[in-house]
């Protein structure tokens, strides 16, 4: 009706407020996690219960890091992304706050969630969480990554590193060459876990990112608790691709719903046949 008013709300974690703080600063003799923690604590007043670092590696101190004209959110996201640290958000039900969790390995994934594949039809039981409209996309990605840099203090040192994480996978092709990742040592390319911030470390990290784009999945679910950072497995018949059956990591969610009209008090329109429908994106 003409008297009807629509409202829109955007719900974001508290960390989103960091994009309102633009700074020019220099950080000396600190590692990436130390710089991030310093910004969260000293500049934004966050306390220990507001964030959690669950890291499996020890990151070296950098002589100098500059923040020039970047907002704090973009700055820490860039720094964390350089070394492969990712973050997600969880809820502390005791303190009633959101918590930012920073991780650098698969140990940070939340596992154990399994949902059935049930297409939306009259046979679907009300209130049963399910997955449908599953789709997979595949593409050819780079076969290996080469990195190169220059350390003026050891001008004759070999700073080349070449990594193929798949060790000869035939479905990949080509080489990605990266110069100037700003590392001081080449590292061991044969080590599965090379020294953090070495040439082999950056080469392996970059190749893993390319491989993450090799297979992408999308689906729709009615599960209200599913969120990025969780590993989802789907059970069912032939409609379930092997990637979903083996487990996929959820990287993005898009949720929407409609107001119910069953009680006669809602005049906005017909009842949504799939309340709480959520579109998810994932990779294997």
Regions inferred by a protein language model and the residue ranges of each:
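Amphipathic alpha-helical and helix-coil boundary elements used as assembly
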Residues: 1-284
């Amino acid at each position: 009706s003409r008297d009807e008013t629509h409202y829109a709300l955007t719900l974001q974690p508290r960390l989103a407020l960091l994009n309102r703080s633009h700074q020019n600063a220099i950080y000396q003799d600190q590692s990436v996690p130390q710089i991030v923690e310093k910004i969260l604590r000293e500049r934004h007043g966050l306390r220990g219960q507001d964030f959690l670092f669950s890291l499996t590696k020890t990151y070296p101190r950098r002589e100098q890091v500059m923040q020039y004209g970047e907002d704090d959110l973009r700055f820490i996201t860039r720094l964390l992304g350089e070394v492969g640290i990712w973050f997600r958000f969880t809820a502390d039900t005791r303190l009633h706050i959101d918590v930012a969790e920073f991780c650098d390995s698969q140990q940070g994934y939340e596992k154990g969630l399994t949902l059935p594949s049930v297409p939306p039809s009259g046979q679907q039981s009300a209130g049963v969480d399910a997955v449908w409209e599953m789709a997979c996309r595949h593409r050819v990605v780079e076969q290996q990554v080469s990195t190169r840099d220059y350390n003026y203090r050891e001008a004759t040192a070999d700073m080349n590193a070449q990594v193929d994480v798949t060790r000869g996978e035939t479905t990949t092709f080509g080489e990605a060459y990266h110069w100037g990742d700003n590392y001081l040592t080449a590292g061991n390319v044969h080590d599965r876990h090379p020294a953090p911030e070495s040439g082999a470390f950056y080469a392996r990290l970059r190749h893993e990112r390319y491989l993450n784009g090799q297979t992408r999945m999308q689906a729709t679910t009615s599960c209200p608790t599913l969120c990025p950072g969780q590993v989802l497995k789907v059970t069912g018949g032939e409609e379930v691709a092997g990637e979903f059956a083996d487990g996929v990591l959820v990287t993005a969610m898009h949720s929407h719903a409609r107001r119910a009209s069953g009680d006669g008090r809602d005049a906005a329109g017909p009842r949504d046949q799939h309340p709480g429908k959520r579109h998810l994106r994932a990779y294997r």
